[in-house]
């Protein structure tokens, strides 16, 4: 039996204000709140809210047979709480259906998994706690930033107790193999891997309303027929898109919401089912092995990290940012911790890309770099004031060790407290 795994990803960065060199050391607030609020409300009203309402209708109309997953960064949830609480309400309603899986993702939508393992673990923990507090759900499956995957990352995730990760079904990794099955990681056989079907996902994201595309006009019945026609034995079809596909990339006038709402009817009529990622890895056995020693993502033509790390500007920003990670981990200053998380957002790096900046407020990659580095310089000064570089590495390591031991002790006590309450 063929199963469809639909995932929708929600994230947007905080808008940075124009921050000039002479403000370094004087102005410690880096964000354009008005622009952020305006953008978040536009996302919610045009895309996210109508999408969530459509998903709820799909669950109800299918009598609970429609299942899907949503990936939301911690910073995105923060923005919903601050600027558009109606989104929190609809997400709670979806969580209550038990038909929607909410995925584990880095809190700040960062590259921490590549640059600082401790930071990545913290972010996954923070985001998981936020999902549990706000929505009452426990994240089981990992959607790393931009579907980032490496063998080493899969191994580290396995040590953390996770059993499944999502990534891109890129041709240079798959070769002749189909993405429509469950894989296991070459680095950790217990770690199951689901792969995005690039072609079928892009049918919705980029080609749905393109009159020059071979499958135009697309409708739910035609799409269901395409899925049904896939070879026997391809049991899980992973269609994962940015949530903004619905209402923004493909505006409501294209019929994209009607298409989505009708899909369960035509799929179920053809005896196809719907699964969340957690259900897929639980019910389906791994049939092949995935190996990718180098970063694999869903970004750009190369499906790697080059969009974010491919030039000297991006490398300088990343190296300077993560050079202070251990010192930031020592800090207790709430504002500093908040800035640390927000400044790791990969979208700021994307703005520094010479080739593909996408939609941006900056005139050039260099303009984006200068603005970000001015902000980063002020942030680094703040870190230096709290934990100067004059502190020897040995002393720093001892402080970190003490803090980690305290964190572990607190965690053990909290676990005992939870058991006692039960």
Predicted regions and their residues:
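Short, well-structured secondary-structure segments
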Residues: 3-8, 14-116, 140-143, 163-168, ...
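Distinct, well-ordered alpha-helical segments
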Residues: 81-84, 150-158
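Acidic, His- and aromatic-enriched active-site or binding-groove loops in soluble protein domains
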Residues: 87-104, 137, 158-178, 183-195
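Short, charged, surface-exposed secondary-structure boundary motifs
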Residues: 113-115, 173-181, 203-205, 286
């Amino acid at each position: 039996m063929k199963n469809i795994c639909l995932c929708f990803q929600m994230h947007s960065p905080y808008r940075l204000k124009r921050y000039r060199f002479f403000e370094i050391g004087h102005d410690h607030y880096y964000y354009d709140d008005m622009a952020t609020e305006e953008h978040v409300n536009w996302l919610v009203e045009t895309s996210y809210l109508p999408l969530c309402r459509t998903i709820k209708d799909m669950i109800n109309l299918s009598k609970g047979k429609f299942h899907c997953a949503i990936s939301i960064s911690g910073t995105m949830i923060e923005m919903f709480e601050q600027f558009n609480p109606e989104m929190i309400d609809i997400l709670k309603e979806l969580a209550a259906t038990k038909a929607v899986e909410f995925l584990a993702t880095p809190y700040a939508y960062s590259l921490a998994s590549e640059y600082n393992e401790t930071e990545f673990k913290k972010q996954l923990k923070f985001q998981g706690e936020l999902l549990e507090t706000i929505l009452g759900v426990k994240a089981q499956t990992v959607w790393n930033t931009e579907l980032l995957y490496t063998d080493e990352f899969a191994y580290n995730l396995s040590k953390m107790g996770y059993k499944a990760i999502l990534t891109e079904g890129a041709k240079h990794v798959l070769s002749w193999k189909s993405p429509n099955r469950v894989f296991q990681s070459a680095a950790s056989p217990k770690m199951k891997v689901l792969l995005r079907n690039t072609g079928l996902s892009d049918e919705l994201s980029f080609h749905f309303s393109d009159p020059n595309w071979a499958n135009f006009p697309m409708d739910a019945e035609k799409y269901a027929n395409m899925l049904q026609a896939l070879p026997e034995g391809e049991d899980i079809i992973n269609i994962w898109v940015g949530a903004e596909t619905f209402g923004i990339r493909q505006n409501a006038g294209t019929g994209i919401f009607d298409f989505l709402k009708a899909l369960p009817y035509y799929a179920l009529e053809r005896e196809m089912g719907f699964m969340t990622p957690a259900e897929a890895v639980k019910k389906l056995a791994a049939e092949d092995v995935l190996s990718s020693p180098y970063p694999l993502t869903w970004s750009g033509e190369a499906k790697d990290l080059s969009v974010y790390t491919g030039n000297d500007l991006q490398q300088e920003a990343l190296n300077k940012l993560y050079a202070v990670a251990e010192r930031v981990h020592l800090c207790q200053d709430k504002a500093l911790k908040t800035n640390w998380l927000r400044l790791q957002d990969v979208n700021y790096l994307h703005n520094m890309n010479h080739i593909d900046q996408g939609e941006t407020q900056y005139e050039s990659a260099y303009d984006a770099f200068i603005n970000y580095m001015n902000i980063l310089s002020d942030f680094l000064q703040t870190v230096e004031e709290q934990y100067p570089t004059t502190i020897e590495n040995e002393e720093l390591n001892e402080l970190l060790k003490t803090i980690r031991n305290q964190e572990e002790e607190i965690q053990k006590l909290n676990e005992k407290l939870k058991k006692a309450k039960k």
